[in-house]
Amino acid sequence: MLCSLSLVLCGLLAGTRADPGGLLRLGMDIMNHEVQSAMEESHILEKMAAEASNPQPGGKAIKGLSNMKVKDVLEPVITLNFVPGVGISQCVSTGMTITGKSFTGGNMEINVVLNITATDRLLQDEEAGTPVFRSEGCEVILVSVKTNLPNNKAINKFVDSTLRKVLPGLMCPAIDAVLEYVNKKWAKLTDPMPVDKMGTVKYALTSPPATTASHIQVDFSPVVQLQEGQLIQLATDGSLPEFPEGSAKDSQLLLSATFLTAELALLQKSLEVKLKDKRVGKLPQNTRTLAGFIPQVAKTYHKPKPLLIKVKINKPPKVTMKAGKSLMHLHGSLEMFAARRHGKHPKSLFRLETHIGLEIHYSVQDNRLQMVTSMDSLLSLARESSSVGDFHEAELTGFITDYLQKAYIPVVNDVLHVGLPLPDLLAINYNLAELDIVEDALVLGLKTE
């Protein structure tokens, strides 16, 4: 008994698209789940039936009907279809029993099955910048009517008149109420969300949502801001990221590598550390171990001195992505010191310019994007200064790589543990998402269960 009518969530087609940092596709799976959830969680049909059964003082009475009650509301059946350039057609089928005393003086009982139609538009709220649904109309179509009253012309006219007066006022406000319930699930979308205490991320819309034959698409131009107020601009070079081919009907969130790069810029200062009292395997971190790679160190330090290492990150971390693999690039310097007694400042042995490549492993926990890194490679190592004479940096590659893996990577992962916020909309459970690394982007396949 499903109908062809439509609750329309109209997405305005975007014009010239700016370079988005994120793309969201809402397929029929998510939309079905959200509309059904709004109907169930709001209990709106039951509430409307209760209100109809308890009219307010001063309410307009229906001629020929008294003591009206509405009961036995059937669970609604909802079917959705996308309408390109318009929105979503929705069919809501339900039924109920209307009782009362008719003009004949007897008890009346009408069992009715109906479809509700409405046209609603998905707009972008000018003030908040969030999507918002607005209803433009509503109709109630009768599918079947059964009554305990005699079957004659006068009774049939009375039943028809009663239903035409009761049903629109009962069902159409219910549809509006469901839309309001859904609107609340968009309300926090553009609120700034913290990244530890370093800054915030705000998912601003690039343009109003667009509707195709298979999905609604929302383009994001995220605003990344340091705690002090400085905005971090997303890089505009490179091609626009795209969803994988053949996934047009799936609900997906795409986060570009440039957006993730901007977010990690919030954490740059936290990645600069001083390390000491560390071991690489069985090797103690002292000048005697270092002398095995740079013999000149043994001439200066006859007795072993503890080593201190300072890691400085000179550029914001950069994220790159190829199919199946993502790297975090850290450009900076690594300076090694020998500790000295009696409160003296450590002695700088050398400073190396470094380019570190860390492989990123993604997951979602508590609806935040989590990153865990592991050492991929030491992409470059160049001597900037040295107090222990000349040496070949290449001879230190293995030692430095092992040290970074054992001592520095845990620090990086501890910093990343804060997680990166994901768009807060429609109560989407990102913990269920399937993650896929594609060219220049991370794609989250969204699930409802």
From Swiss-Prot:
Organism of derivation? Mus musculus
Its predominant location is secreted
GO MF annotations in UniProt = lipid binding
Q: Where in the cell is it found?
A: Secreted
Q: Which residues form the signal peptide?
A: 1-18
Query: Keyword Disulfide bond: yes or no?
Result: yes
Traced from the root, the source organism's taxonomic lineage reads:
Eukaryota, Metazoa, Chordata, Craniata, Vertebrata
Q: Is this entry keyworded Ribosomal protein?
A: no
| Pfam families, per database record | LBP_BPI_CETP, LBP_BPI_CETP_C
Cysteine pairs forming cystine bridges in this chain are: C138-C172
Q: Which family does it belong to?
A: Belongs to the BPI/LBP/Plunc superfamily. BPI/LBP family.
Instruction: Give the positions annotated as glycosylation sites.
Output: N115
Q: Which UniProt keywords apply?
A: Disulfide bond, Glycoprotein, Secreted, Signal
Q: What is this protein called?
A: BPI fold-containing family B member 6
Q: Which GO terms describe its cellular component?
A: extracellular region
**CDD domains this protein is in?**
BPI1
**Which InterPro entries does the record match to this protein?**
Bactericidal_perm-incr_a/b_dom, BPI_fold-BPI/LBP, Lipid-bd_serum_glycop_C, Lipid-bd_serum_glycop_N
